């Protein structure tokens, strides 16, 4: 409660919708000033001259396109062989070509090895994966970490239930049910795709299932 006292709530059905947060990289602890997550990227105090984005999923590519359109020099680095990494190869090829046509530098199959702040700039060392081995040196004024998100599964007491957690996300079936009867999980905490309309549909589907209806699964 508001006074700090513990409360015990009981329910026949429980829906977990605790969301997720940006994944942090040990080499780039977020400070909100020169190392951003998607939250800081939405409300920047000023336009960075050089922006480097780590991760080429939906979030990384969206911000790359936006910041390039408003005048920033943008570089995108990704560990996977192509971007976006989870799309079909022909779609990835079109996206990569479009980004390069807009003047966005794209580096795939590279892993962040080291990051140091020197004066007003970040110096990043990336290890090339596959093909010719070596390192790549890049500089940026601001680094946006878009390397995925982590489900908010802590402090929920899940260890006392049959709810399963894999890769920081709650495991559910097609009706958003967990392994614990009566406990559901929806939205970002239930894993990808991390999209608002997916979470909204899951919420409706989950409640309809609880009400005894037979909603269509995703």
Which residues does each predicted region cover?
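Short glycine-/small-residue-rich Rossmann-like dinucleotide-binding loops
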Residues: 19-20, 128-130, 144, 148-149
């Amino acid at each position: 409660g508001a006074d700090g006292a513990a409360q015990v709530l009981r329910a026949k059905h429980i829906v977990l919708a605790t969301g997720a947060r940006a994944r942090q990289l040990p080499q780039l602890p977020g400070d909100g000033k020169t190392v951003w997550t998607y939250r800081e990227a939405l409300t920047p105090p000023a336009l960075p001259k050089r922006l480097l984005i780590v991760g080429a999923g939906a979030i990384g590519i969206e911000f790359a396109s936006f910041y390039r359109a408003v005048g920033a020099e943008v570089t995108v680095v990704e560990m996977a062989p192509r971007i976006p990494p989870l799309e079909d190869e022909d779609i990835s090829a079109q996206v990569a070509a479009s980004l390069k046509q807009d003047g966005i530098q794209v580096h795939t199959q590279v892993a962040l090895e080291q990051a140091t702040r020197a004066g007003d700039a970040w110096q990043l060392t990336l290890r090339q994966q596959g093909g010719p081995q070596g390192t790549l040196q890049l500089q940026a004024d601001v680094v946006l970490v878009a390397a995925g998100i982590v489900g908010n599964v802590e402090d929920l007491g899940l260890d006392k239930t049959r709810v399963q957690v894999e890769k920081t996300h709650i495991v559910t079936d097609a009706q958003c049910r967990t392994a614990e009867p009566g406990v559901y999980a929806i939205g970002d905490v239930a894993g990808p795709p991390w999209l608002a309309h997916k979470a909204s549909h899951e919420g409706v589907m989950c409640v309809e299932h609880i009400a005894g209806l037979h909603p269509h699964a995703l």
